[in-house]
Amino acid sequence: MKLIVSKNFDKKDSYKIDTYIAGGGYEAVKKCLESMKPADIIEEIKKSGLRGRGGAGFPTGMKWSFVPKESSVPKYLAVNADEGEPGTFKDRQILELDPHLLLEGIMIACLAVGIHTAYIYIRGEYKKAFDRIEAAIAECYAKGFLGSDIFGSGYEIDIHAHAGAGAYICGEETGLIESLEGHRGQPRLKPPFPALSGLFAGPTVINNVETLACVPEIISGGAEKFAALGTPKNSGTRLFGVSGDVEKPGVYELELGISARKLIYDICGGVKGGGKLKGFIPGGLSAPIMTADELDTPLDFDSLAKAGSMAGSGGVIVISEHQSIPKIAARTADFYAHESCG
């Protein structure tokens, strides 16, 4: 299987611009500037079948197309890097190990939607990730990849990194917007939806880190190749962050549709210490727990929803026979009461 999002993770100095360029980086955004119209970019993303990797799995190309082509006020892109849900840590890998992949995805999204300003909202505890993103942005400005004339094209894109303050609720898209504007991070009532009136009352696209990191490969390699991975309605790969009672925890890039059994046992070595599996959480702490009898469920958006859980943020938490489900439920309730109520 071809790695898309994690292909540079093991390279020396993977976070530096010269390493990224040497591996073909920024060729996709150049292709967009030289030979693709905004509508062409959106159509390619639609054909790829890319769905949001942050939770709901909404089709990315469709989300981009909701933003008005003409606007009397500036349009914005807000990148949700506020990875605060327990059991979720995949986006941190992209931010720390391949920040330029994210930046190129942001540039392409801006070209597709007619945006000139993007903000990356990074979890407050992710100090190393924030520093890596800031350094990568500075490298892009130094080479003329960002600013008033990107790649000599005459198009202007500015990207800003913004550190949150550790509030989980700011991972909700309108709470994130409120925080970016300098207000208390409290979700807004919808409508209006961000695509029409979001950040600073302008039309706003909000995408997850991993979602945007998929975009350069779709443009450079073609939508068909991306769509050939995964399943017909759940195309591409996904980063799975595996934790809990498991032998080999970590972040793994795999095709959507892989079974929980194959991920937990074949790839991650099974339950820690050879114990028995009691259950697993497939998409971060907010996803309903699944039982050992459901191990053959494909880990994709539609299959997990049909099973009564959700793909969520891709955080797979393994639960052994030694854990108490009532205690896990109580701790989960405590977390959400503290972070989302009052």
What are these regions (language model features)?
Residues M1-S48, I115-I120, G236, G274-G275, ...:
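Iron-sulfur (Fe-S) cluster-binding modules
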Residues Y20-Y26, N80-D91, P194-L199, G241-V246:
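Gly-rich Lys/Arg/Thr-decorated short loops/hinges at beta-loop-alpha junctions or inter-strand turns
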Residues A28-E44, V73-K75, A81, K90-L95, ...:
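Ferredoxin-type iron-sulfur electron-transfer modules in oxidoreductases and energy-metabolism complexes
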Residues L33-K75:
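N-terminal glycine-rich phosphate/pyrophosphate-binding loops that anchor nucleotide-derived ligands
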Residues K47-P59, Y168-C170, K278-A287, S309, ...:
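Local cysteine-cluster metal-coordination motifs and their immediate loop/turn environment
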Residues D98-A112:
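Histidine-anchored nucleotide/phosphate-binding helix
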Residues G105-A109, L256-G273:
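Short amphipathic, charge-patterned alpha-helical segments
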Residues F130-L256, C268:
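Hydrophobic alpha-helical positions that pack around
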